[in-house]
Amino acid sequence: RSRLTLNYEIIGKSDEEITKLASSNPSELNVEELLYAATLTSDPAKQEAIYTQATKQFPNDYRAFNNLGKLAYQAGNVDKAESYFKKAASVNATPEVNMNLGLISLMKGDKAAAEAYFGKAAGTKELGESMGNLYIAQGQYERAVNSFGDSKTNSAALAQILAKDYNKAKNTLANVTRPDAYTDYLMAVLGARTNNSSMVTSSLKSAVAKDSSLAKK
């Protein structure tokens, strides 16, 4: 109830009204309302339709293009994501857009382009993680460890393993927020690096149970 009241005060329309107008009469909504409408659904197809409409009504606002890029990226369509991010950058090359273009470049193996984009992404909260991944790709493991800082992610642990900081890697893997098959796989690698055969066996078993494709590794 308080959230609804808040929306009335800030936007002037309830969530229900905004959702309805987004599909029936989007021209009644301003850019903030339209972008907000996309957050009221968890259906990527509906989000895409709303953001696409926003790009038509407000072509000079980069955010809808950027968000379409994120949706494409999450769906695994890297080329489509890149074209949306480039369109967003042509409207307004914000640090966030540069960050996203850097991630695309890194995925495509263009480390020089990734570094250039990340250089324009100062202030984004993901920069440390992204630079860490870039340094791993470049083989600069100590710099990668420094970039990740105290981040508790699989990528941070990988950097620590490659830099031979095994105690830190073990602590990182034990504190990953949402551990997955790759977390277990890295724990197995760590076990192999530290001659802990029982850790290798138990971690590999757990990893393969979550993702059978890891058995081939």
Task: Describe every region a protein language model picked out.
Residues 1-187, 191-217:
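N-terminal targeting segments with Sec-dependent signals, encompassing both cleavable signal peptides
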